Amino acid sequence: MSLSAEQKAEIVAKYGRSENDTGSSEVQAALYTAQIDHLQGHFKEHIHDHHSRRGLLRMVSQRRKLLDYLKRKDVAAYTALIAELGLRR
């Protein structure tokens, strides 16, 4: 199950540069982080759900690519985002 529209709107409002900013790297990485956190709870109950685990690994990889891009372009925004999301990078 994915995030609800309200949850996505909260993330966009918190990390976006404007109200309708859904394309910036910060917003996309935050959305991926929320989806990954949701799926980790799913896997605690459904250990053998390998099909969804593949989707999780794809999301983790895509988030890593976005964060690497952000680190190259704006180191200050990268470090602030990592601290706010609570990621170990």
Swiss-Prot record:
**Where does the source fall among the domains of life?**
Bacteria
Q: Which InterPro entries match?
A: Ribosomal_uS15, Ribosomal_uS15_bac-type, uS15_NS1_RNA-bd_sf
Does the record's keyword annotation contain Cell division?
no
Pfam families per record: Ribosomal_S15 (PF00312)
The answer to whether UniProt assigns keyword Phosphoprotein to this entry is no
Which Gene3D superfamilies does the record match to this protein?
Answer: 6.10.250.3130, S15/NS1, RNA-binding
A single BP term in Gene Ontology: translation
Q: Name one GO cellular component term.
A: cytosolic small ribosomal subunit
Q: Name one GO molecular function term.
A: rRNA binding
Write the record's keywords in alphabetical order, separated by commas.
Answer: Ribonucleoprotein, Ribosomal protein, RNA-binding, rRNA-binding
Which protein family is named in the record? Belongs to the universal ribosomal protein uS15 family.
HAMAP family referenced in this protein's UniProt entry, alphabetically = Ribosomal_uS15_B
Q: What does this protein do?
A: One of the primary rRNA binding proteins, it binds directly to 16S rRNA where it helps nucleate assembly of the platform of the 30S subunit by binding and bridging several RNA helices of the 16S rRNA. Forms an intersubunit bridge (bridge B4) with the 23S rRNA of the 50S subunit in the ribosome.
The subunit field of the Swiss-Prot or TrEMBL record says: Part of the 30S ribosomal subunit. Forms a bridge to the 50S subunit in the 70S ribosome, contacting the 23S rRNA.
Protein name (database record): Small ribosomal subunit protein uS15
Origin species, per record, is Psychromonas ingrahamii (strain DSM 17664 / CCUG 51855 / 37)
Q: Which gene encodes it?
A: rpsO
